[in-house]
Structure formats: structure tokens, C-alpha cells
Amino acid sequence: MVESTKEFDYIKIKLASPFRILQWANRKLPNGQFVGEVQKSETINYRTFKPEMDGLFCERIFGPSKSLECACGKYKRVRYEGLICERCGVELTESRVRRHRMGYINLIYPVTHVWYINSRPNFMALLLEVEEFEKKLDTTYTTHSENCKKCDGLKLTTSTVVDLWDERVKRIKLASLAYFIAEDEISFYGIHWDLQQYRRSRELGYTGYPLKPYPKPQNRRYSTPKYLLRATPNFLIGAPLIKRELEKLNLKSEIFRMRYFILVCTKVLNKEKPIYDESRWFRKWEQQRIYKIREQAIKRIRILENLVGTGSSPAWMILTILPVIPPALRPMIQLEGGRFATSDLNELYRRIITRNNRLLRLLEIDAPQLIIRNEKRLLQEAVDTLIDNGKRGKIALSANNRPLKSLSDIIKGKHGRFRQNLLGKRVDYSGRSVIVVGPSLRLNQCGLPYEMAIELFQPFIIRELINQGLASNMKIAKNLIQQNESIIDPVLEKVLKSHPIFLNRAPTLHRLGIQAFEPILVQGRAIKLHPLVCSAFNADFDGDQMAVHIPLSLEAQAECYMLMLAPYNFLSPANGEPIIMPSQDMVLGCYYLTVNNINGLLGSSHYFANLADVILAYSQSKLEIHSAIWIRLEEQEINESILLKTTILDDETKIEFYENLQIRKTKDNQLIVQYVQTTTGRAILNYIIQKTLNFL
């Protein structure tokens, strides 16, 4: 087997074309036969317990169940590897190919992708400009504006609101077309005529659809000639009609047209803003309507640009070829007693194949259109359930009333394929533990449990023991570590001093979800985390767990120090604002530390030469945290306006008393010393800030 090591920079997920799905699943055998289409809903034979041919576990499509052994048993040797059995058509290869070989179902009737027709916003409706998408920008409504600017004569009636809205676009409901739900038969054909007229008007250069108010839609059952219904073929209703309209979209010209339309909306809003500000409900309503039109146009242009950027066609939202994932990813396991446990996906695929084959038989016998439409709707619902169970309508249940697990359920969520199996999988040189707060840590530090550090850094400890001559080989070094000898601790501290670690908290929603720290050994089994970095990780201390990863190469360690340390990730990449900000108990602690006006405390009215003397007295319990004290200041002028009193001493010097200041001067008014009144807590806060900024 040839292993390929192709390098790549990123993975792009986009719409798959029917041709690409066939490339995944369709294979040509040496005898010229094509295999890959799953035609039967059977899984395994109930007598032989072997996969049924052309079924969901077919060995001809997905590969042999047993390595180098065909289905009929004719070939069972390694020397036949690569041979295709002429009797059963199975290729003799490894059974592991059943993990990546795909199949496909050729749908008789195209179906819509449930993610795009039942999403918010509705992508198909935005692209086709139907349902709630307004196509009219009416800024020439002059019936009342010239006579009465504030529109006092205009009364709010149903007909007025109908005139202001383009009601025609609301006729076309894509869900009604796809699921055959409507009041009258003509609604199934509405998109064919309305969009045709709309597209023709745009090709002629019109910016709006109807430039005059359109009457309220009525039931068209009695006003439509019967021959028009008979002239429209049945394959032009439902999903095929939506597919045809999506194929007709010229993406680049639509982008140009929408950009021009957005500019028109913006100019209208800027030009008529004074009128909107002065007017009453009518003009206010018109302003909100234009805002909504512009917002819808912006959403549409984003979808169009994404389609152009990925090289996708909007018609690929309609499925004609349905891929079948490999059987090893949806296994069927035999239990004790002869029963089988199977994945829910097999039941969902079985429903689709059964309904697809039944629809084919109904079309072959020319069944009534009512029955065929019902079968098409059932096929659409079966595909919806496979892709996303419960996205639209009732949730499909299994035999024991348990919701069936669809493809979306396998991918999304905490226990989905991405978060649990890819982002959260176990790797070497990593560990996991609960986090607790470590307020005494520096911002670039974290507390690493001793047991975890011994296990994670074991290779580095062994190398250091051998380099220092404390162990002659790896086996002796491992024995020293297992016996927890005292010589291990200084070696471990030396290793940790120059080796950073990564901390990661799932889900990693942005790049700040993984940051580097310098580890500090702590007792216990919990990781200590600085409280200021919690906002970047979106972490709290109610039982959250974090993963520890060890950078092995010198390049990775250099990247830790240069890019990924917590102090270097001060700003949020989303908006550029600081993401490391004090909150909760830190703010409360700062407030409590600086509270004053508490009288009668220990050490009040004492005088100190500097901040260090205050810290020393507080550490010796000579002061309380809120004691009012006096601290000498450097020679700097402080403007105090209200002089309370002046005292002249025996040496002819004087002391001026202000509200929070005492200044001693000579008889010539030269400054000798000055003291400012504060509290012990404020002195401590000031000392910490000055020491951090290297002012002390």
C-alpha cells in the first residue's frame, strides 16, 4: 500500500457537485463494469449473515468483509491480491477499505437539501428572491406627501399596507413546492411564471419588479385556464423546478446588480432622512422597510460571493445523487443470542432506498399524480431525516421510541465528531485535570500538579539524569522516577524552568483558547490558573477541565515564548479590545482595599517615612487594613485650596493643616516636609503598582 504525504494548509468545506459525488463512489472494474450504486435496501442475508449484493453492505461496492477473501469463497489467498472474482465481482484486497469506500443512491426525483431550504435565513429564498424577499423600492409615493408632510390624512387600513408591500413575492413558498403543501393546485406552478416574468424584467434593465402597487393575491384556481396546467409537465413542479431556476442564475451579474441596488438604498435613506425624522408612522414605516430591503440585499450578496469564491453552483443545493458513507462507519454488530445491533444511519438509508424504488415503480406503471406526489414528498422527508432529523417537522423515532441519530447529530455538539473525536482526542505528551484559581501566580504562570509533571516530562527528566551522571542508562533512570527518589525534584525543577506548556480548554472557538504558560509545581491534582486569563478561555472554576500539552521541538518552544504566552495575548482578535480585565472578586478586592473613613482602628494617625515602612508595620500587625495613617511625600507641590489652620512651633517653623495634607515650612516659607493622609490599603495598592512599573 502506497502512503501519500501530501502537505496542505487548510481544509475547505463546500457544496459537492453530483459529478464529484460520483467520483467519490463510482469505480470501474477491469471487466468494464461500474460499481458504486446502492440499489437494494437489504443489509445482510438472514441465513448466511453475509452482505447482500447491491445492498447497504455490498462487498462488491465497499470491499470484502474479510481481507483477501471474496464473497463466494473462490479466492482466499494472498497471492490473489488485486484480483477481481469473476463469479461475485468482489475485489481481493484488505477489509479496511470498507472504512473509506463510498457508495451512492441515484435519486429518481431530485430533493432539496434541508440545511438550505429550512435555515434562517433561507438560502434558496434569498437567491431566488422569493417568499419574504422584497423586490420593490418605492420612493415615489406622492399621493399624500405633497399635500401633507406628516400624513395626517392617511389612515392605517389593510388596503394601504397591501399597497406598500410587494405581495406577489409572498406567493412563492419553496417549502410548499418541495413538500407539495398548498391551498390550490396552481400554487405548485407559481414559481415557473412569476420568476420568468421577474427575470425578463431584470434582463430589460428594470431595477424593481413592479414599480406600482400590486393587488392582493387571490385564489387562482378559478382564474387559470386548464390548458396552462396541462401544458406544464409534471417534472417542472417541486424540487426540479427550483433546481432549474437556480441553474439560470448568473452569479457575477447578480453580484453587480445587488451592489448597485445597495447603493441606491443607501442614497435614498440619506436623501430622505430629514423627511423620515419629521414624519409620523407612514414615513417611519417606509424607512424601516428600506432598511429591511437593504439588509436582505446584503445577505444575498454574501451568499453569492461565497458561491463564486468556492466555485460552487447554487443548483447543487438540490440533491440528485445521494452519497452513502462507508459501512465501517455505520456498522452492524452481532450480539449474543443471534441478535444484531446496527447504526441508525442504516435504517435511514433503508427508508430512502425503499421509497426511491417505490417511486420508480409508480412512474413505470403511470400511477395517478396524487400518489406520485405523495411518494415524492415521502422521499424528500426521508432525505431530510438522514441529513438532519427534526430540522423540519416531526422527529423520526426508532422501534423503541428513541430519536434516530442523523448525520448532523453525529457531527454537531459536544459529543460530535469534531469536538470529541478530532479536537478532543487523546495525544501523546498531554494530560487533563480540573482547574482551580491561583491568585498568587503571575500572568505568564500556571500551577502544574507534581504527579502530572513527573509523567509528562519523564523523557526530559531521564535525559537530564543521564547527562548529570545520576543514572547510567534509561532503565535505572525510570526506576529512580518510580521510586520517587529525592534527587528527582531538583532535576524536575530545572527542566520546568526552561520548558513552557500549552493549556487548552474545549471548545476552542478562537485562537485564545490555547495559550502558553510557564509551569510552577503545586501540590494536589488540580491545575492552578490565573483569574485574569479566564475570560480568554471562557473558563470558570465550577468544575471546568483543561488539557495540558508539551511542546517538544525547539521551534515549538520558541513559538511559545514569542507568540503564545498569556501576556502577549492581551487583545481580543475579534474586536481589538482588551480581553484581560479585572472583574468580580478582583474589583471587589480593590474596592475593599481602598475603603476609608473608618475611625478608631489600630495604628490610626501614625506617621511613616515611606510606603515600605507601612508594609513592614502591617506585616507585624501594627496596623489594620483600613487604618488612617500619614505618609511622607517627596518634595512636590500639592495644591490644596482650603487651609484649615496653621501652628507655629518653638523653632519658628510652622505646620499648615489642610483636609488630607500637613506641610511643615520654615519661617521663609521653604518646604521642609509634607505628609498626606491615606489608609494602609491604599498604601499597599500604591506600593504594588509602583513596584510593578519599576518606580521603586
From Swiss-Prot:
Q: Which SMART domains match?
A: RPOLA_N
Gene3D superfamilies, per database record? 1.10.40.90, 2.40.40.20, RNA polymerase II, clamp domain (4.10.860.120), RNA polymerase Rpb1, domain 3 (1.10.274.100)
Q: Which GO terms describe its biological process?
A: DNA-templated transcription
Q: Which GO terms describe its cellular component?
A: chloroplast; DNA-directed RNA polymerase complex; mitochondrion
Query: Could you tell me the EC number(s) of this protein?
Result: 2.7.7.6
UniProt-annotated location(s): Plastid, Chloroplast
Cofactor detail note:
Binds 1 Mg(2+) ion per subunit.
Protein family (similarity comment) = Belongs to the RNA polymerase beta' chain family. RpoC1 subfamily.
Q: What is this protein called?
A: DNA-directed RNA polymerase subunit beta'
Tell me the organism's taxonomic lineage: Eukaryota, Sar, Stramenopiles, Ochrophyta, Bacillariophyta
